[in-house]
């Protein structure tokens, strides 16, 4: 159902898996990967969101790498620069905001495990992200630097 697309991020180009609903338009959501990378489960979730009427995008935060081995997944996670991941997520939000198929007033963001943490953090990364859901997040706040000031007052 979906396809790999490229979008601007980190002063270069990032990739992600995009699926558009059969109706051709709908609100947009970012789906953030688990520890394993952009694997079949994540692309299936993106396709299911599209099946429910959403324009869905999963950015590839490991840039082409994925695994089913726990030790390798931990290595990939430890090598993930949170500032680069943040820019990839913000880039995905900007990309979705500019898609003609996006009929929403903002972007939603969901994630699983590592992605659950990043989904919750994403609301502080881009003003376009207006709703987040983190499924079983592990919150490595020491590796993140959320800016909560935009929610003050």
Question: Which residue ranges define each predicted feature?
Answer:
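A catalytic-pocket lid/entrance helix-loop region that shapes and gates access to the active site
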Residues: 77-80, 149-153
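Primarily recognizes the serine-hydrolase "nucleophile elbow" in alpha/beta-hydrolase
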Residues: 90-151
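Cysteine-centered metal-binding/redox modules
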Residues: 1
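Serine-hydrolase catalytic machinery in alpha/beta-hydrolase-like enzymes
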Residues: 4-102
């Amino acid at each position: 159902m979906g396809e790999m697309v490229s979008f601007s991020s980190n002063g270069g180009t990032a990739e992600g898996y995009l699926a558009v609903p059969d109706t051709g338009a709908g609100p947009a959501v970012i789906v953030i990967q688990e520890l394993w990378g952009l694997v079949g489960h994540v692309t299936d979730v993106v396709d299911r969101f599209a099946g429910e009427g959403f324009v869905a995008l999963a950015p590839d935060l490991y840039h082409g790498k994925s695994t089913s081995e726990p030790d390798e997944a931990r290595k990939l996670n430890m090598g993930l620069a949170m500032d680069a991941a943040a820019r990839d997520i913000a880039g995905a939000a900007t990309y979705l905001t500019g898609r003609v198929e996006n009929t929403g007033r903002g972007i939603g963001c969901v994630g699983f495990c590592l992605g659950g943490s990043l989904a919750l953090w994403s609301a502080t990364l881009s003003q376009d992200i207006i709703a987040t859901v983190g499924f079983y997040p592990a919150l490595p706040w020491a590796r993140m630097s959320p800016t909560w000031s935009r929610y003050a007052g």
